[in-house]
Curated annotation (Swiss-Prot):
Pfam family, one: ZF-HD_dimer
UniProt keyword Disulfide bond, yes or no: no
GO terms for cellular component: cytoplasm; nucleus
High-level lineage: Eukaryota, Viridiplantae, Streptophyta, Embryophyta, Tracheophyta
Name listed for the protein in its UniProt record: Mini zinc finger protein 1
InterPro entries, per database record: ZF_HD_homeobox_Cys/His_dimer (IPR006456)
GO biological process annotation, one example: regulation of developmental process
Length: 105
């Protein structure tokens, strides 16, 4: 066996950032992500279009487990549900200064 590796150290990503920096960036966003109606086409194999009517994703298990990615209502994976991101109020530091009078007419 080879030497033991320290698994607690931050591992760099391909872009040079570390896992700790990436996690800190996710926490700063404070965005709420919800998964709404299921969009899985159950009739795709026969050339049709039919959805099951599931209105909102409900996790089957605890956060961090494989079951958390399956919907308790329809049994589909979370990726089949429409993703909705509720962003905080946009903080725009930009201003439109049209009073200079140097624009074209």
């Amino acid at each position: 066996m080879g030497p033991q590796q320290d698994r607690s150290a931050a591992k760099p990503y391909a872009n040079g950032s570390t896992a700790a920096a990436a996690a800190a960036g996710r926490k700063e966003n404070n965005k709420v992500v919800r998964y709404r109606e299921c969009q899985r086409n159950h009739a795709a194999s026969i050339g049709g279009h039919a959805v099951d009517g599931c209105r909102e994703f409900m996790a089957s298990g605890a956060e961090g487990t494989a079951a958390a990615l399956l919907c308790a209502a329809c049994g589909c994976h979370r990726s089949f549900h429409r993703r909705e991101v509720e962003a905080a109020a946009a903080e725009c530091d930009c201003s439109s200064d049209t009073s200079s009078g140097t624009g074209r007419r």
